[in-house]
Amino acid sequence: MMRVIILLLTLHVLGVSSVMSLKKKIDGPWQTIYLAASTMEKINEGSPLRTYFRHILCGRRCNQVYLYFFIKKGTKCQLYKVIGRKKQEVYYAQYEGSIAFMLKMVNEKILLFHYFNKNRRNDVTRVAGVLAKGKQLNKEEMTEFMNLVEEMGIEEENVQRIMDTDNCPSKIKP
């Protein structure tokens, strides 16, 4: 009986440890490097899904994530905060309709994400993106992103380097 209790406690500690490790990796400043979408117009300059990420916070046990990003409207950058709530492995949020998204850590400096956006007219757009702590991706990181783009059924020519048009404030207070 004592062995079972020790085993259960060990498994619980390992589970908490992995959540804390994930939280430590996700929390912090991030910048959008590339975006790709099934409908190019949705990520063109001035479009609502062209997101210039700045910060992600992982809530308790990472069951919620707080996404902070800018959208450009003309020459002005407007800051948004969107809360994703996790159900199983997928986060759900409200922004330009409903969004179902997933996050994937490549390493401590690279985070891939993909989502489905269903707007008010029930049109669905598939989006893939890569966030980074730096300004460049190495060859392996770019390959991993392009594999995600392909898995999402997004055409390679629909990939845009977002970093080049990002002139929104670099720091925010989440």
Swiss-Prot record:
Q: What is this protein called?
A: Probasin
Q: Which SUPFAM superfamilies match?
A: Lipocalins
Keyword check for Protein biosynthesis = no
Return the GO cellular component terms, semicolon-separated. extracellular region
Where in the cell?
Answer: Secreted
| Annotated PANTHER family | LIPOCALIN, PROBASIN
Q: Which InterPro entries match?
A: Calycin, Lipocalin, Lipocln_cytosolic_FA-bd_dom, OBP-like
Q: Which gene encodes it?
A: Pbsn
Q: List the disulfide bonds.
A: 77-168
Gene3D superfamilies documented for this protein: 2.40.128.20
For this UniProt entry, what is the primary localization, expressed as one broad class? secreted
> Where does the sequence pass through the membrane?
none
